[in-house]
């Protein structure tokens, strides 16, 4: 099932890059033209990741697989920091929350450590801050 998730991320990245390539150079600047950062592909990706996470949790995955999925969701956005896709991949980090009860305590500790390495506290949006807090609580 993780291959399906990885495929969703790859497809989304490719689509967002294509949207950016096809947009006029100053599209979206000063509110003019169609801003490629507001293309429907971004919200569609986020909605799809929520649906995937719900299906995944319902499938009763084993802890090792859950850790692989959570790590993927946490680490992937930073690989694409300079792309339009970054922000919605970053928002999708919030999809780790339903996985937390399925993770071992040590896995939660490892994810908290990795979270700290990747995302500085002052850069976290409320959803990521909430995800971090839940991971930290589960790690205790």
What are these regions (language model features)?
Residues 1-140:
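Non-catalytic all-alpha helical scaffold/repeat segments
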């Amino acid at each position: 099932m993780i291959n399906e998730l990885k495929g969703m991320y790859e497809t989304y990245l490719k689509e967002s890059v294509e949207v950016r390539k096809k947009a006029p150079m100053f599209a979206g600047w000063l509110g003019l033209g169609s801003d490629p950062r507001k293309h429907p592909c971004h919200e569609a990706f986020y909605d799809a990741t929520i649906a995937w996470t719900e299906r995944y949790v319902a499938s009763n995955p084993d802890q090792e697989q859950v850790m692989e999925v959570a790590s993927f969701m946490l680490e992937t956005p930073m690989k694409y920091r300079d792309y339009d896709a970054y922000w919605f991949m970053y928002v999708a980090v919030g999809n780790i929350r339903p996985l937390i009860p399925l993770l071992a305590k040590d896995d939660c500790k490892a994810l908290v450590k990795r979270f700290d390495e990747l995302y500085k506290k002052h850069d976290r949006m409320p959803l990521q801050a909430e995800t971090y807090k839940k991971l930290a609580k589960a790690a205790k």
